[in-house]
Design a protein with these regions (language model features):
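Register position in tetratricopeptide repeats
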Residues: 2, 36-37, 70, 104-105, ...
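Structural marker of alpha-solenoid helical repeat scaffolds
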Residues: 19, 53, 87, 121-122, ...
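Helix-start (N-cap) detector for alpha-helical repeat units in TPR-like alpha-solenoids
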Residues: 24-25, 58-59, 92-93, 126-127, ...
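Canonical tetratricopeptide repeat
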Residues: 29, 63, 97, 131, ...
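Eukaryotic alpha-helical solenoid repeat scaffolds
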Residues: 273-274, 279, 283, 290-468, ...
Length: 614
């Protein structure tokens, strides 16, 4: 884990757990690896298993508390930090995390008690003073927050985050001169946080320094190109100076990035009015009214647009609704939500540590240099692989071939005694392997297989038997002539003994699916025949489930994936595909659990899907 190869780490912990399932540490460390991959359901199961084996481990409570925080189960997180502190009462990290968890629960007094306890031990810690200021901001005590941030700046004058926090706090208190000076100090110290430029841009805007505001917003966009607030603020500023087309571009981008922020549509409506886009104005105001039915300016803007469209009746309806609401001003002002259509202040720059890194460092103590096996997976499996986009597609069928890619990372048991016995008999020119992905052939290899087809054809013409016909079928399949491969299997199966019939029917089913016009009914019959002759042939259940998915027969597909897993509890592909099927029919909890298991068993692509679907 020191080298951030979390997928490979999980495989090693799997091996330890198989050998010594009574140990608590492998479950904890596997949980930590899953935390790095943001598989919090899987990590939670492992933490629970660790604590079942050793309920006196503060690290396990710490890790589980972190997981609960990510799942926003704040009370459970606090309970775990209480347990961790019971065994390690002086631990700084545990206290800080409990304070933050209490703040999330709006238990501000209790959170400040934890922080003050730390300040007694470390009165000159800028980090702890900053945390105190942050909790005070959450409790709307800006004076106490300002005092705490000033203390932080006293002890750490070169940290841009401290000056950012001071700047935001003063901006909230409408002390713009102080805020401007502090935000500029943060930027001068090398701040890479877009919020500093956003907030200083707001001050420029209030001072009518539009050139300065635009310069700061441009820099904020460069630093954080997917931040909706930056585009929104720049759009408002551009509207102010009459640059309506570019204002529209910014507001469109802001709403694309944050479609749930309906309040942004009001400013876009104002720009649309200037651009004479009357229908778009009405559409935006309707969306805004649906979210904020007591926001009167939306009714009046929609009425103006209707008037411009010549729809006087529609304009009257909007004005009448607004006038009716005017009579309920007291009700509106006493509790009805109103959108904020002003410039948006960026929150204080977070100073939180990435505790996932801390977990990883803890777990990787005493690790040695990477072995040859570890280096093998460098490019694909290291780091935050959950951030790498993966298509939402099933794992492919498992077939038999002479050629296969290395799949040693996966824990699926790519073995069946019938196939092993066939390989040992040397009835075929080479050994068959189970695979989900066959190797591409070079031109030289293709020529070799054509010559093999010619050689086998001469032997079959002389003395046809099941082994020769099946061998030629495999050669046809290798060069992708699946129709000829299926024909040879059909001739071979009537001559074959029971064991060879199992293998031939399985291969024929796989190849039928690859034909240009697959016959799924015959394919399913072949898989059923394999299952009838050899009920423990897990790959037949799995492939049949894949066919059922293509036919949108989700429940039967799930049933067959489950049967495949019953015969191989480490069948990674079956867990993965069953997980996607559950998610497709809306059973996300079961689906995420299966994807977590698939990731644990080596299908690292599952972690990106867990991140997207959780």
């Amino acid at each position: 884990m020191y080298f951030e190869d979390y997928v490979l780490s999980i495989q090693y912990f799997n091996q330890v757990i198989r050998l010594k399932p009574y140990l608590s540490e492998p479950y904890l460390y596997r949980s930590i690896a899953k935390i790095q991959l943001e598989d919090y359901q899987g990590a939670l199961k492992d933490c629970n298993a660790s604590l079942e084996r050793n309920p006196f481990s503060p690290g396990s409570y710490y890790a589980r508390g972190y997981i609960y925080r990510q799942l926003e189960r704040w009370e459970d997180a606090e309970n775990d930090y209480n347990e961790a502190l019971r065994f390690s009462p002086e631990n700084r990290t545990y206290l800080l995390l409990r304070a933050d968890t209490r703040a999330q629960r709006k238990l501000y007094t209790a959170a400040l008690e934890d922080i003050d306890q730390l300040l007694k031990r470390e009165p000159q810690s800028a980090t702890i003073w900053s945390e105190r200021g942050r909790v005070c901001i959450l409790s709307h005590d800006t004076l106490q927050a300002l005092e705490a941030f000033n203390q932080a700046a006293t002890y750490d004058k070169t940290n841009p985050a401290v000056w950012s926090q001071l700047g935001v706090t003063n901006l909230m208190m409408q002390r713009e001169d102080e805020a401007y000076s502090q935000l500029s100090q943060a930027i001068q110290l090398g701040s890479k946080w877009a919020g500093d430029y956003i907030n200083r841009g707001i001050i420029h805007y209030h001072r009518h320094n539009y050139r300065g505001a635009l310069s700061d917003y441009d820099q904020a966009v460069r630093l954080s190109p997917n931040d909706a607030d930056t585009y929104y603020n720049r759009g408002v500023m551009r509207q102010e100076v009459g640059d309506y087309n570019r204002a529209m571009e910014d507001l469109d981008k802001a709403i694309d990035l944050a479609p749930e922020r309906t309040e942004m549509r009001y400013q876009r409506g104002l720009v649309e009015m200037q651009l004479k886009q009357w229908k778009e104005v009405v559409s935006d105001m309707q969306a805004l009214i649906a979210r904020y039915p007591y926001f009167l300016p939306a009714y009046y803007l929609a009425a103006q647009a209707k008037t411009k469209m010549g729809d006087q009746a529609g304009a009257y309806r909007y004005r009448k609704q607004a006038q009716d609401l005017e009579e309920k001003k007291e009700q509106i002002q006493s509790g009805q939500a109103q959108p904020n259509t002003d410039l948006i202040v960026a929150d204080a720059q977070p100073q939180k540590k990435d505790h996932r890194k801390e977990f990883s460092a803890h777990a990787a103590q005493n690790q040695q240099e990477p072995t040859e096996d570890e280096q093998k997976y460098d490019s694909q499996t290291r780091g935050s692989i959950q951030k790498r986009y993966q298509d939402v597609v099933n794992e492919p069928n498992i077939s038999l071939s002479y050629y296969s890619h290395d799949m040693s990372l996966r824990r699926t048991n790519y073995y069946h005694p019938i196939v092993d016995q066939l390989n040992r008999s040397e009835a075929l020119p080479a050994s068959l392997r189970f695979t989900t992905q066959e190797m591409s052939l070079t031109a030289q290899m293709v020529d070799f297989h054509f010559s093999e087809i010619n050689r086998l054809t001469q032997l079959i013409d002389a003395t046809p038997d099941a082994a020769l016909l099946f061998a030629r079928a495999i050669e046809f399949a290798v060069i992708k002539d699946y129709a000829s491969a299926v024909d040879d299997c059909t001739r071979a199966v009537v001559m074959a003994d029971r064991d060879m019939e199992v293998v031939i029917c399985f291969c024929r089913a796989c190849w039928r699916e690859r034909m240009s016009e697959p016959d799924y009914e015959l394919t399913l019959r072949d898989y059923d025949q394999v299952i009838r002759l050899q009920p423990d042939f897990a790959f037949a259940y799995y492939n049949k489930a894949n066919v059922l998915c293509t036919q949108r027969n989700w429940r039967d597909a799930i049933d067959h994936y489950t049967k495949a897993i019953a015969h191989d509890s480490d069948f990674a592909e079956a867990y993965f595909n069953r997980g996607l099927t559950y998610i497709y029919i809306g059973e996300n909890e079961k689906g995420l659990s299966d994807l977590s298991k698939a990731g644990e068993l080596g299908i690292y692509q599952a972690y990106n899907l867990i991140l997207r679907f959780k």
